[in-house]
């Protein structure tokens, strides 16, 4: 049975080790016993600190007493060996005085053991196929000087009583790294004795290996006087061996004794039993195994630490996942609530939209009718009514052909001017519509109203001033012409004309009726002259020139005009024209002299130009005479001064 204290090591003996072992044993045989007695004291003092406490089974003290025959000599009794009986190999503690670091065994051992197969000295023994006879030991002869105080020195020869003794060749194994020792101190001797057992010989023998504890250190060797004896008690169990150590009270700390049995093998030649050589194992190999165990333990510690860290990381990861899951669940619940509220609001909005989409035909129809009525009243019907009223309004009736005094009225002049303005506006409207007809649009829309022409901003005060200037210019020409033609009239006519001038001074415009008299009336000297009005003499001329009421006309039948063209032209504005005509001096006190000519300059913008064909019959008679005279003298000498005074004439407004 294998011991639990040491691992099983294979048995591999070598011849060099055997020769070395026998050389050492011969040295111990030739050495005198005096060396043991001389060095006994030194070894006795050196082993006081050793500790040989071993946890072994108790034994009987009387068997190990000094008076017993076991203490006098070391011998093996011829007893049957049990399978549990074995030889014990005790590793002695290290001493600084030892000569070598090897372990020694006795040269001759007579052992009674069963035949075993030498498969392994440290393994379980096998049953022998043949029976082994019991062996008997002879008691060795002891000398008188070999006994010491504390123990007996072993004899070198053990004899068998009935059969020749078996002398095995012990093996010498190298121990741990050698230590430097003193050569004068002899080596220690270890005596190993097998223990008899009560078991029969036919049973197996077990090897008990006591391995030292895994402590780093070298093997402790015992000196020569120290004797380790292993004796068997009277009754021992086959399971555990008994180890007895004598020779000193020193203790062996942190060391375990290896007990190695010596298996007996039967020799096929002579039929005797041969004891195999026991092997004393040192602690060298245990150091390698200790290193391997230490590395294994370190790997286990590292593996456990890494496993712990991985479990910790996994736990932290799981905790993080749980926290994220909780946050996601809470956020999901919140989003579900918000989604529900938004869905409810959307349903409310959709329902409200459906209610608002319900058509209301009455309201819509009323709104459309109101808009149409507003458009018709503001644009269409009002303009149509105005045009109809303009068309229906009668024109100014011509004066009856009868005799009447030369007079004029401001009210009549105002009515006449208003009528002319309305007529001109009506004609302007029609002209605009005709111009629009010439464009791409073939038909005018029903409610289309032509926009008024784009006019620049006009200062009202400036417009009134210009109008007053032009009307005064025309009026003064008419007054001067009337004075020159009626120098021969009576005082009554002069008073009437004076009253008319005073009455017209209140208004800005004063029109003078033009009366055409015959040569008979001119030559007559009566106070009352017949006035023959000819209203149709100018109407044809007005139609020919398309007269408008809001425009001043300057008509000349002379050919001797001075025309000056413009030197520059701006494309963004209308062409400008300035008309310079003779004028009547307003106040003779301002300019009094014959060195200056009074002229009127009229600045205007050209709106339109066209060629007119006027019948000669429509031209007034007095203008025809001037036309003939000016035509004949166009390329001749200029007219006289008397003729130039009558060139510019005015048309009375009563005939317009």
From Swiss-Prot:
> What residues does the record give for site: Cleavage?
406-407
Location in chain, cross-link Glycyl lysine isopeptide (Lys-Gly) (interchain with G-Cter in SUMO2): 75
Q: Where are the residues of the annotated region Disordered?
A: 75-169, 391-429, 632-656
The cross-link described as Glycyl lysine isopeptide (Lys-Gly) (interchain with G-Cter in ubiquitin) comes at 139
Q: What is this protein called?
A: Cyclic AMP-dependent transcription factor ATF-6 alpha
User: When this gene is knocked out, what is seen?
Assistant: Animals have normal retinal morphology and function at a young age but develop rod and cone dysfunction with increasing age.
Describe how it is modified after translation.
During unfolded protein response, a fragment of approximately 50 kDa containing the cytoplasmic transcription factor domain is released by proteolysis. The cleavage seems to be performed sequentially by site-1 (MBTPS1, S1P) and site-2 (MBTPS2, S2P) proteases. N-glycosylated; in its luminal domain. The glycosylation status may serve as a sensor for ER homeostasis, resulting in ATF6 activation to trigger the unfolded protein response (UPR).
Q: What InterPro entries would the database entry show?
A: ATF_bZIP_TF, bZIP, bZIP_sf
A Pfam short name: bZIP_1
- Gene symbol of the encoding locus: Atf6
Spans of biased composition, class Low complexity?
Answer: 78-101, 111-121, 632-650
Q: Where in the cell is it found?
A: Endoplasmic reticulum membrane; Golgi apparatus membrane
What keywords is this UniProt entry annotated with?
Answer: Activator, DNA-binding, Endoplasmic reticulum, Glycoprotein, Golgi apparatus, Isopeptide bond, Membrane, Nucleus, Signal-anchor, Transcription, Transcription regulation, Transmembrane, Transmembrane helix, Ubl conjugation, Unfolded protein response
Superkingdom of the organism of origin: Eukaryota
* Residues bearing glycans: 459, 570, 629
Q: Which organism is it from?
A: Mus musculus
Q: Provide one Gene Ontology biological process annotation.
A: visual perception
GO cellular component terms attached to this protein's record:
endoplasmic reticulum; endoplasmic reticulum membrane; Golgi membrane; nucleus; RNA polymerase II transcription regulator complex
